[in-house]
């Protein structure tokens, strides 16, 4: 099982120097990937906040801009969005930005995507929330087609998208029933929201069963979870439990207040947790 960690592209940690120190330390470690998230325009107050978003996230660096930043300051580690809210962005521009990250990073980008949920952000961006699933499928279809064809059609216009997209692994985020079928049809795996190993086990099995029926034996599961690192044995047992139910890439998420603190957590995940995996 691969191991990753979050890197916060928001708040007081989202400065060039802070992000560079953290990303380059992770790059020098044996950590497999670092992950970051997406918000475009946060309202001053939230009516619906199921994921406990901080009321004031401070500065939020765009994840695709951050991906290009990481491409230039790292050389080995993979990095990805957990998740990119894909209906927020125009299809062709999204394709261009992802292709640019892939080219500049040597194909190290991992694309976790989600259809979004925040009513206020959809309203601010002028995107109908009711069409988020359809828009998501349209953009994923374009990404897949542009990685295979020199010419693609967008809004009735044939265009050549260059650089041609080296398709990154696409992980479909969320626990909605449509996520797994979408992953099988248009992605490379599933990225569920924080769930226990027992909760994930039947869904991962269902994904592989349905995937096999569709000729897809390559599907992976990426899962983000805050491991109880202060309790070493408990954290190792939990990581092993995720591995046992079929999680392919476990991402530890937590806050940190300095590059040195970030480095300590990276060392715990890449050292103690990795050593404890079966």
Predicted regions span which residues?
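Active-site-adjacent structural elements that line small-molecule/cofactor binding pockets in enzymes
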Residues: 1-278
């Amino acid at each position: 099982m691969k191991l990753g960690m979050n890197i916060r592209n928001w708040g007081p940690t989202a400065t060039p120097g802070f992000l560079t120190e953290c990303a380059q330390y992770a790059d020098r470690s044996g950590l497999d990937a670092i992950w970051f998230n997406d918000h475009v325009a946060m309202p001053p107050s939230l009516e619906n906040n199921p994921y406990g978003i901080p009321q004031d996230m401070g500065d939020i660096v765009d994840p695709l801009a951050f991906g290009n930043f990481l491409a230039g300051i790292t050389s080995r580690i993979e990095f990805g969005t957990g998740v990119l809210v894909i209906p927020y962005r125009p299809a062709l521009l999204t394709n261009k930005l992802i292709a640019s990250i892939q080219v500049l990073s040597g194909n190290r980008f991992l694309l976790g995507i989600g259809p979004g949920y925040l009513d206020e952000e959809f309203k601010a961006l002028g995107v109908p929330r009711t069409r988020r699933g359809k828009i998501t499928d349209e953009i994923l279809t374009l990404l897949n087609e542009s990685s295979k064809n020199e010419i693609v059609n967008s809004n009735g216009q044939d265009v050549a998208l260059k650089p041609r997209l080296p398709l990154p692994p696409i992980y479909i985020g969320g626990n909605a029933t449509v996520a797994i079928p979408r992953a099988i049809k248009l992605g490379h795996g599933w990225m569920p929201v924080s769930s226990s190993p027992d909760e994930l086990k039947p869904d991962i099995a269902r994904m592989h069963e349905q995937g096999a029926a569709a000729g897809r034996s390559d599907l992976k599961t990426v899962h983000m979870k805050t491991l109880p690192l202060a309790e070493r044995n408990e954290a190792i047992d939990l990581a092993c439990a995720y591995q046992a139910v079929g999680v392919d890439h476990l991402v530890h998420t937590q806050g940190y207040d300095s590059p040195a603190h970030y480095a300590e957590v990276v060392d715990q995940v890449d050292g103690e947790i990795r050593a404890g995996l079966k």
